[in-house]
Amino acid sequence: MLLGSQTMSIDRFGLLTGTIRLASGVSFLVDPLRANKLWGDPEEPTPTAQLLLRSMGYRDALIGALLAGAALRGKSTRGWFLASAGADVADLVGGMSVHSELKPSQQIIGLGGAAVGIGVGLWGAVRPTTRPATRTVTEEPAP
């Protein structure tokens, strides 16, 4: 450790949330058809919808990886939690615009999942930090 360096413990909630978002994003990249079914759509999506599913996968994988990485390094995760909430707001607003065209399972899983994600992201951004910083001081050896 360097003189006066700050070390913070791992943000477990940030790591868990980031890992879940990363895994969800990767699932949309690896097999968007299966992931789409998990989110409530039993039908095969059109090629345009598959493109959008993959785009959502890249977005979620990126946000999840950066959130988990910050959590592992003991860095602030607030910004990544806000990015996560923002992504879910976009999903919810987009889903609400086609709400009447969605099947009940899509409404519950897709829109409900986005609403939960918004809550998790906002709470993650504003929650009190219980991880105290520990100051490490190393002394130089005497000559």
Segment roles from a protein language model:
Residues M1-P143:
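Short amphipathic, positively biased membrane-proximal segments
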